[in-house]
Amino acid sequence: MAARIYIGRLTSRVSEKDIEHFFRGYGQIRDVLLKNGFGFVEFDDKRDAEDAVHDLNGKELGGERVILDYSKPRGGGGDRGGFGGGGRGGARVSSYSGGGGGGRDRFDRYDRGPPRRESRYGRPYSTRHRVVVENLSSRISWQDLKDQVRRQGVEPTYAEAHKRPNEALLCFATPSDLKRCIEKCDGMDLNGRKIKMIDDSQAGRSRSRSNSRSRSRSRSRDRRRSRSRSSSRSKSRSRSPPKRSRRESKSKSRSRSRSRSADNRKSRSPSRSPKKVDRSPSPPRGSRSPSEKGSPRRSRSASPMDNGDGDN
């Protein structure tokens, strides 16, 4: 079923070749219609149009970020008839005129931001039901591979190609879709090569389980180590006396030095006091001492023999 896309914010420099190059890899394009400031692109498959809107909306084209939206014919007009674009709330956009002028003024509401309409199939998402595609030609893109799988009646939820040379990855919503894809597409000839499909869901599960087990083991080991370290630290802390802060040690050392200096002063003070008494000025040589004052002094004149005076 064909589908048409509206392109807003187109510059005058963009040509049909630029449009075809912009949408390359998103399926077959039927028609390109360019207007002044906007345009339309018609795809053969509606799903290709939805993928293009989802992936390319807001991308740069000709130096401007273009706006992509779905367009539906209103009332069966032709290429020049009116089309309406639907937002999430079902709001209608004014009809696209087939004339040339004033296109940018009519669609100023698109300048507020990209449309919020989601794809019918939802956004691409990866699942654990995965298929690895080998021997894929380098000329086959992920979109081409996805289209081939769709033609077999299976809808992939996610596709990527050539992250590894000649390999691709497909994801599916259910295991039954995965099996159907392998049954119908394994050995298919694409561009001269027979592709090989391998179920990768079991490998992914085993890897995730082994990773989770190894992580849990490593975590338990780390916890044991941390517990042993904490216990040893607590024991060493309890055995060793508590450390004193620098301030306390400094203050205590100062108080000890002060007390020592005070003791030294006290011990020195009694030894110095008698010395002070000894240092007192001695009496002059001519003066008598107190002991001599009390005792009578003998003089040579007092003795009778020395004086020579007698009774004679």
UniProtKB/Swiss-Prot annotation:
Belongs to the splicing factor SR family. Residues 206-259 have a biased composition (Basic residues). It comes from the Eukaryota. GO terms for molecular function: RNA binding. InterPro entries: Nucleotide-bd_a/b_plait_sf, RBD_domain_sf, RRM_dom. Its main location: nucleus. Residues 103-121 have a biased composition (Basic and acidic residues). Residues 74-90 have a biased composition (Gly residues). Keywords: Developmental protein, Differentiation, Growth regulation, mRNA processing, mRNA splicing, Nucleus, Phosphoprotein, Repeat, RNA-binding, Spermatogenesis. PANTHER family: RIBONUCLEOPROTEIN RB97D, SPLICING FACTOR, ARGININE_SERINE-RICH 1-RELATED. This is Probable splicing factor, arginine/serine-rich 1. Residues 3-73, 129-202 form the RRM domain. Extensively phosphorylated on serine residues in the RS domain. Residues 69-125, 196-312 are annotated as: Disordered. It is found in: Nucleus. GO terms for cellular component: nucleus. Plays a functionally redundant role in spermatogenesis and growth rate control. RNA-mediated interference (RNAi) of rsp-1 and rsp-2 result in reduced brood sizes and abnormal egg-laying behavior, and the presence of unusual vacuolated structures in some of the secondary spermatocytes, spermatids and spermatozoa. GO terms for biological process: cell differentiation; gonad development; mRNA splicing, via spliceosome; regulation of growth rate; RNA splicing; spermatogenesis. It holds the Pfam family RRM_1.
